[in-house]
A protein has these predicted regions:
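Bacterial N-terminal signal peptides that target proteins for export
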Residues: 1-3
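C-terminal motif of bacterial Sec signal peptides marking the signal peptidase cleavage site
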Residues: 9-12
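Cystatin/cathelin-like cysteine-protease inhibitor module
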Residues: 14-138
Length: 138
């Protein structure tokens, strides 16, 4: 019974963003107060590196890493800072899967989630080399 209560309480901390009308899908781990005046994520590069170190199966040996600076975009009807990222990561077997493009959404200057289907979020993004990502280790 205690395990079921713990699991239910942890599930309450995570919500499906589709349920919140954001329309982008994925899990959301931060409380979105819905304020329109979002602070700029000054340490976005550090946040992205920390996230990708745990997100990627093999964070070593990344190629072709590029990132755009955060800009304000409308995500699910709310203004958020979003930055776009391109990289070619290794699979577990050491092969490369090809360049992936992702959008990273920030709430209250903290990385909230990564969106795989970037659609309009990354349209017109100006990318610059992201050598720190190519130097990432496990």
């Amino acid at each position: 019974v205690a395990i079921a209560v713990l699991a239910a309480s942890l599930a309450a901390c995570m919500t499906d963003s589709g349920d919140q009308g954001r329309g982008q899908g994925g899990l959301v781990y931060t409380d979105d107060r819905g304020v329109a005046d979002q602070p700029f994520p000054a340490d976005y590069r550090t946040q992205v590196l920390a996230f990708l170190r745990t997100y990627l199966n093999n964070p070593a040996g990344i190629r072709d890493a590029e990132m755009a600076e955060p800009v304000q975009r409308t995500v699910g009807g709310r203004r958020r800072y979003v930055n776009c990222l391109r990289y070619n990561a290794r699979e577990i077997d050491g092969s490369y899967r090809g360049v992936a493009q992702r959008a990273i959404v920030y709430v209250d200057a903290r990385l909230d989630r990564m969106i795989e289907k970037t659609d309009d979020l990354c349209a017109g993004a100006v990318y610059a080399p992201f050598p720190e990502l190519e130097k990432l280790t496990r």
